[in-house]
Design a protein with these regions (language model features):
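Feature captures the catalytic cores and cofactor-binding loops of soluble hydro-lyases/lyases
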Residues: 1-58, 72-102, 106-114
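Generic structural signal for buried aliphatic residues
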Residues: 62-63
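Channel- or pocket-lining gating/hinge segments that regulate access to a cavity or pore
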Residues: 68-70
Length: 114
């Protein structure tokens, strides 16, 4: 793993039980029985690639969870993170108002997020 935090695959993986036992997150397009023996080869190293049609380059942030994966290009990282933290703050205010008894329609009109 050499310091990797996880792996993003544009296709199926196998040996999923072993991968899960490693506690190493792997985001993939499915599970299948085939290996790459005789079919796989290294074409290039450390070059931009496309994964599910999205460009992924060295230095990009990749966030993944049970709901999916998002790639944040390094060039807009600061802007995207600032917007994400603003959204989290807004969601917290929304939740606080709902817990305080405010109606959903009012809270949505006030903040524009749920």
């Amino acid at each position: 793993m050499r310091g990797a935090a996880g792996a993003l695959m544009d296709g199926a993986v196998r040996d999923i039980k072993a991968i899960r036992a490693m506690n190493f997150p792997v985001f993939h397009g499915g599970i299948g029985p085939l290996d790459t023996k005789g079919r796989g080869r290294v074409m290039a190293i450390d070059v931009p690639v496309r994964c599910a049609g999205v460009k992924v380059a060295r230095g990009d942030l990749i966030f993944g969870d049970a709901d999916g994966v998002v790639v944040v290009p390094q060039a807009v990282e600061a802007q995207v993170l600032a917007l994400a933290f603003d959204k989290i703050k807004g969601e917290k205010r929304t939740l606080d108002d709902l817990r305080a008894g405010q109606k959903l329609g009012y809270v949505f009109a006030k903040y524009g997020i749920l």
